[in-house]
Amino acid sequence: MFRLPHRMSRGSVAALAVAAVALSVTTNVVAARAEPAEPAGPQQRLDRLVTKTGLPGVIAAVGDADGRVRTYTSGTGDLATGEAVPADSRVRIASNTKMYTATVVLQLVEEGKVDLDATVERYLPGVVRGPGGDGRRITVRQLLQQTSGLPDYDSLVVEAGGSLGAVAHTYYEPHDLLDAALAEERHFAPGTKWEYSNTNYVVLGLLVQRVTDRPVGEEITRRIIRPLDLRDTYWPRVGEQRIRGSHPHGYLADAPGAPWEDITRMDPSLGWAAGQLVSTPADLGSFMTALVGGELLAPAQLAEMQETVRAPHFDAEPGWRYGLGLARAELDCGVVGWGHGGDIQGFETRNLVTEDGGWAVVAVTALPTSMDMVADVSDAVEDLVCAADR
């Protein structure tokens, strides 16, 4: 549903599982947008990822600055039948949803309907009040930047027994998520620290709905998905547990080495505006390219989005910085990569786009059970995007 950063930093597999309360593609390749994969370095890199980690399968899309897109798969798409991973797979992209939610908020800023430095209270009077935080002291910018101090709502999973499988078929209203977070103690004073919390983006989803008087999923669809013709990206309907169209099965394990449990059918409402979207690696790459390329935001708002702060423990690899729903890393090959990533029951996605237009998206078909596995996926994405940028 969302992204694993802060949970992973706790250093235990149990925390990893509870953490995957948060989320961070597959590649549905439409002929007009992609070319068939050719046997080369990327295929070997993904084969090695599956062999080393024991993850069931992987789907990746790689794009270069000239607009060429190639897709690759490795491993097994259905452990029960042994079928391969479909090349046109859709997956749950989890916390990558935050990039879409942030883009809508920044479009509202451009339209003069939202002020980044106004308090949450202006738009949601009386909504954010409790031990976990006070909307009168938190700004919209701090929500986007993950510096609000609002705690996450991991308690919902803990109360269900600590297993993500236990909440896989539970429907949550957005206010259920917010209420669980506000019942916890505030982690720090707003603006004094960075810490990843899905609650920030739940509040932003509520803000979008209050300002536009429309559902946040509808605004994401109207403002981003349709204009970019992302035909394999969609916001699941209320209560919708299946993944539409071609997709691999997604898996979850209780601990390293434990059997993989099929968790493909699940209710993504635990992620909502922080992690509910379904997409393909190719569509996700197209979105990131359009975002960083200035197609979705005016220069002033894109500059705000790319103004970053240190983001310790954002991912298994150090050195990340976080902007307004978009993260930045300096890669070993000497280029700057922008992206996010996400983790949810059944899937993990990592992605990067460079300012030169090269990009890579990798989705694995199980939630990793160790920090080493997360690092392996992140390393694979970096290798692919660096090769694409040459």
State where each predicted segment sits.
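Short active-site loop at a secondary-structure junction
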Residues: 53-56, 80-141, 188-197, 272
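Solvent-exposed coil/turn segments that connect beta secondary-structure elements
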Residues: 77-79, 148-149
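Secretory targeting and sorting signals
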Residues: 1-35
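Catalytic loop of the DD-peptidase/beta-lactamase superfamily, centered on the K-T-G motif
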Residues: 2-6, 31-73, 212, 259-390
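Hydrophobic (often cysteine-bearing) scaffold residues that line and stabilize catalytic clefts
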Residues: 38, 42, 93, 97, ...
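Short, solvent-exposed loop/turn elements at domain surfaces
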Residues: 71, 80-83, 152-154, 335
